[in-house]
Amino acid sequence: MCGCVGVISNVDENFQVKTIVTMSDIDYEALEKEVPLDDIDFSDLEEQYAVKPDFGIDNFVVVDGAPIAPEAKVPVLIKVLKKLFSTVGEIVEGEEGIHMPLEDGKSKGFLFIQFKTAQMADAAIQQMHGKKLDQKHRLLVNKLSDIEKYGIEGNVPTEFKEPEIPPFKSHGYLKSWLQDEQGRDQIGLHYSDTFGVYWNKRKSPEPVIEPRKGFTSKYAKFSPKGTYLFSIHPQGIQSWGGAQFESISKFIHSQVRLIDFSPNEKYLVTLSPQPIQVPENPAERASYPFGPESNGHKLVIWDLATSEPARTFALPPHLEGQKEMPWPLVKWSHDDKYCARQGPGALAIYETPSFQLLDKKLVKIDDIVDFEWAPAPVYLDTSSQNGPGEHVLSYWTPESSNQTARVALMQIPSRQVLRTINLFQVSDCKMHWQDEAKYLCVKVDRHTKSGKTIFSNLEFFKVTERDIPVEKLELKEVVINFAWEPRSDRFVTISRLDDGALNPAIPKNTIAFYAPETSKTKGGAITSSKYKAFETVVDKHSNTVYWSPKGRFVVIATLARSNGELEFYDCTYEEENVRTTSKNNVKLLKSEKFSGMTNLAWDPSGRFVAAWSSSWIHTIENGYKMFEFTGNMLRDESIDNFNEFLWRPRPPSMLNAADRKKVRKNLRTYSAQFEEADAMEADAATRQLILTRRKQLEEWRAYRAKHASAGHQKKEDKMTVIEEIKEEIIEEKEEIVE
């Protein structure tokens, strides 16, 4: 690059001639290489031309609500307020730090505080706004920039402007799967990082939507009635629904681990180990679903209709830091009207939708260990059978130095204790409500006086009878599993003898099927007496009981062991050509092995059972198997990294008693239709044959309808009445004639 140098003569204010050398088009890069700039000291220039930081008004806050004090006491008041606000940020030194205006010899009730940074001012607003200085004064803290923004006339429009309401977005019919012509159920399959929803078919599942990778970061879960599907992500929860499982709502709750629902799908409960932190930035805070009152809380109840938080809670101190969290922490009444949380020595019962404490106070129950809501309305002996029923919960308290263990029933909202029993030498209690809330079974694990041996008692509360009688069933063994039959008074237990021999290879568990003994009175009425085992199976490894949702059939399984097994029982088996008045007849239908089985679940109809081995627990035979209720295996799918199998729940049937009776009456007709559909699905040739026969039948019916009028009319036969005489022998007598 070429350059040129010019000489310019100039005359200064003293009329002295100065020569100025100018350069243009110089190769500055070459010049920088020749002159090392790093060696030049610019500190004097930087100091001379340094620009002082402009604090601006974002560093100022206006504090209103301060006491009005005489001028003589203002320095003391400023000292107190400075000490208070210095806890949240550094205040500028000197008179610039705090300014309290005076008028007529006294303060005006507000002051200005200048912090060193805008972040400190934000922290002061967050922590000090609404703080009580004393009983008469509450401090109101705002940014000075907000006062200027909203306080100056003209900055805020005085005319009301209608807010823009976004157009309604339809998600389709959220219960569309119930309209399936074949009445099929839907299943969810989660393997590796892929989740898919499928129609359950006998031969192979049919995708409802394309399986999605990265659908959830942890697990997926259907709501209790199947309306929504929820996925979990680091940012929170996502709900999906409709025929194509479109996105419906997002629930922002960072690092959620556990979720739960109210029975009628009105509310969602989430728990995160990470406490809620409301952003300090006003723009971020505006879109954040939680307010400052939720800071530090970990448990959130959401309104599913609005996707907004209804209430947040801090964890009780005794649960903080626990690795294994008891779940759910919030338990619901059958109709979502009440929910309750257990704390040290008390129950907190809340009314929905306000989520305010019932009667604005806790229910004091010293040393309460656990509680359970009745899963259905309770019709007490004093209740109207046509009414809505009562809300009842049960709870138990342990033994102490001066009182026995107790189990009690309490009516809500009156808090009336309906029934109490006292128990001795109690190690643990588990409460099992029957699904119709007619019975409550309390499994009481008791110990001998030496404390070396454990055995179980079963205490049965007959809730609907007068004065709620309690029946005791004493056992010599420890009950490790208990399950009521749906809509019945029968139940199954799995127990073992606590003899100190804990060799897991030796099968020692006993399966027992119980029902109340019944007898007829002289008037023909049936009365039930004490519970009695009508069938027992000994020396088993079985540890879990799964009743069909429709009752009668039950699967007794061995889970989480290398020798997994399923046993299918019919508890009302009717033998051919054998008449019996008892319905308590157990028959083992089939037994199937499934090594490594970790979970088992019935479909909502009670027709199918799914068992699976989850890679979340181990890597043995991961996949799932599908069975009929009789134990006949339909599918055996081995899937690498298989995580979870989900049945989509169904809402309760809307058929009344008359409709159900009609279905049962025509069951053979419906059964033939389903068998035909199964045959068509199983074999392509059979399907084609059935379709051909259907077509031929339709053609024949159309032909008959077309030519029915072309036939000859039948001639009327002429009738001739013929007189007939009939003789009737009334009496016949024989005589001997000599």
Swiss-Prot record:
Main location: cytoplasm
WD repeat spans: 211-250, 322-360, 363-406, 537-579
Region (Sufficient for interaction with PIC8): 1-245
Sufficient for interaction with HCR1 and TIF32: region residues: 1-120
Stretches assigned to the RRM domain: 59-146
Pfam families listed in its UniProt record: eIF2A (PF08662), RRM_1 (PF00076)
GO process terms (BP): formation of cytoplasmic translation initiation complex
Record carries keyword Protein biosynthesis: yes
One example GO MF annotation: translation initiation factor activity
GO annotation, cellular component aspect: cytoplasmic stress granule; eukaryotic 43S preinitiation complex; eukaryotic 48S preinitiation complex; eukaryotic translation initiation factor 3 complex, eIF3e; eukaryotic translation initiation factor 3 complex, eIF3m; multi-eIF complex
PROSITE patterns documented for this protein: RRM
Coiled coil spans: none
Subcellular location: Cytoplasm
Keywords: Cytoplasm, Initiation factor, Protein biosynthesis, Repeat, RNA-binding, WD repeat
Known function: RNA-binding component of the eukaryotic translation initiation factor 3 (eIF-3) complex, which is involved in protein synthesis of a specialized repertoire of mRNAs and, together with other initiation factors, stimulates binding of mRNA and methionyl-tRNAi to the 40S ribosome. The eIF-3 complex specifically targets and initiates translation of a subset of mRNAs involved in cell proliferation.
Assembly, per entry: Component of the eukaryotic translation initiation factor 3 (eIF-3) complex.
PANTHER family in the record: EUKARYOTIC TRANSLATION INITIATION FACTOR 3 EIF3 -RELATED, EUKARYOTIC TRANSLATION INITIATION FACTOR 3 SUBUNIT B
The family this protein is said to belong to: Belongs to the eIF-3 subunit B family.
Name used for this protein in its record: Eukaryotic translation initiation factor 3 subunit B
Originating organism: Meyerozyma guilliermondii (strain ATCC 6260 / CBS 566 / DSM 6381 / JCM 1539 / NBRC 10279 / NRRL Y-324)
